[in-house]
């Protein structure tokens, strides 16, 4: 009799994805982040579900309902901080996952990569709307500033912003619809992640060398299930340490003040994982230009496959490209730092230079360096 997991219509999908999946024998721990992102999503959906049971999406009671969750609900504080810090962990894993894709040339799987970029946009939208829900000062002003950016769109901008707000300012209608979208989007993300996996399994995984691994495959289980468990344990260690020892480390103190439309906080800034894009937005004096740069800072990822000029897929054997890659990482860290600083000298000029360098590296320097490396190989 054939094994049930290989014949049952549902079980064989799981089997071909997580058990008998032929996997390259040499993939490193950088390939752990896919499974970690799946776990992040599950944790966020579950904690979010329990938070939604106690949360009220009304401007008068939203802030109080979050306080009630933390004080009166059994382990409500734990659920709330797991959800808030889980988002930070989600983005850490996302950035590592995308960075791995750029370094090892995984973007050559076009469909998988493009759905990944779409997933990044969807997760960013979800996180932004989630940040508005506690209805603290930074929630309110963050929502006001970011939604207001759409008014830079010519002709339809102002109408579009008022349509999104459901009125003439961020108010009850805005909060209610943001809650509705924040609830539905993670399920759309889950569906997209399924499609992401579907396309990945059409081609099989990439590996650090960037060479074909068809001649050397091993089953996913037990080798990579065990390897992934190590990543999961480290992930749980970091998340629980954050939640139990310093839950507000990555948050903003202003969000413990209830939203007040009459009092603007001195420094409006988003959560840390949006600061790099926020710095790029602020570095351009023109409003429309800033909005375009903000969108392009993520959309530029979709262009990377078309700028691949190297004869080799991975950066493993390309020291010059490696050097540029780590400069890009340092540049993104600089942008993240600048995004959290006030708009004054010398931060303005540092932000502008870092923004120029970001686009210059991806669009110009990396493709040119790849061409140069191709010629280095001609003895």
Curated annotation (Swiss-Prot):
This is Cytochrome b. Keywords: Electron transport, Heme, Iron, Membrane, Metal-binding, Mitochondrion, Mitochondrion inner membrane, Respiratory chain, Transmembrane, Transmembrane helix, Transport, Ubiquinone. GO terms for biological process: mitochondrial electron transport, ubiquinol to cytochrome c. Heme b b562 binds at residues 83, 182. It is found in: Mitochondrion inner membrane. It is a multi-pass membrane protein. The keyword Metal-binding applies. GO terms for cellular component: mitochondrial inner membrane; respiratory chain complex III. The cytochrome bc1 complex contains 11 subunits: 3 respiratory subunits (MT-CYB, CYC1 and UQCRFS1), 2 core proteins (UQCRC1 and UQCRC2) and 6 low-molecular weight proteins (UQCRH/QCR6, UQCRB/QCR7, UQCRQ/QCR8, UQCR10/QCR9, UQCR11/QCR10 and a cleavage product of UQCRFS1). This cytochrome bc1 complex then forms a dimer. Component of the ubiquinol-cytochrome c reductase complex (complex III or cytochrome b-c1 complex) that is part of the mitochondrial respiratory chain. The b-c1 complex mediates electron transfer from ubiquinol to cytochrome c. Contributes to the generation of a proton gradient across the mitochondrial membrane that is then used for ATP synthesis.
């Amino acid at each position: 009799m054939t094994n049930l997991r290989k014949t049952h219509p549902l079980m064989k999908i799981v089997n071909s994805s997580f058990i008998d999946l032929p996997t390259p024998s040499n993939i490193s721990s950088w390939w752990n982040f896919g499974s970690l992102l799946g776990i992040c999503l599950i944790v966020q959906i579950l904690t979010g579900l329990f938070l939604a049971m106690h949360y009220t999406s009304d401007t008068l009671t939203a802030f109080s309902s979050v306080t009630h969750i933390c004080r009166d609900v059994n382990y409500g504080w734990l659920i709330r901080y797991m959800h808030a810090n889980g988002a930070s962990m989600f983005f850490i894993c996302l950035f590592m996952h995308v960075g791995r894709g750029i370094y090892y040339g995984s973007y050559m799987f076009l469909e998988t990569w493009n759905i990944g970029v779409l997933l990044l946009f969807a997760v960013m939208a979800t996180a932004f709307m989630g940040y508005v829900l506690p209805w603290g000062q930074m929630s309110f002003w963050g929502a006001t500033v970011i939604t207001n950016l759409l008014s830079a769109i010519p002709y339809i901008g102002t109408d579009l912003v008022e349509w999104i707000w459901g009125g003439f300012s961020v108010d009850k209608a805005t909060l209610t619809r943001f809650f509705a979208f924040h609830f539905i989007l993670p399920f759309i993300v889950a569906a997209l992640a399924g499609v992401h996996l579907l396309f990945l399994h059409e081609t099989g995984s990439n590996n650090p060398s960037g060479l074909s691994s068809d001649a050397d495959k091993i089953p996913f289980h037990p080798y990579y299930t065990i390897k992934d468990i190590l990543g999961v344990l480290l992930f749980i260690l970091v998340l629980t340490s954050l939640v139990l020892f310093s839950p507000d480390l990555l948050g903003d103190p202003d969000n413990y003040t209830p939203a007040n439309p009459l009092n603007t906080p001195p420094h409006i800034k988003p959560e840390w994982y949006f600061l790099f894009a926020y710095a790029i937005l602020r570095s351009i004096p023109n409003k429309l230009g800033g909005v375009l740069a903000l969108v392009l800072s993520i959309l530029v990822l979709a262009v990377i496959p078309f700028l691949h000029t190297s004869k080799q897929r991975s950066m493993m054997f390309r020291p010059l490209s490696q050097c540029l890659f780590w400069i890009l990482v340092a540049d993104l860290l600089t942008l993240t730092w600048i995004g959290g600083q006030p708009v004054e000298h010398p931060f303005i000029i540092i932000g502008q230079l870092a923004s120029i360098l970001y686009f210059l590296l991806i669009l110009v320097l990396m493709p040119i360096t790849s061409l140069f490396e191709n010629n280095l190989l001609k003895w």
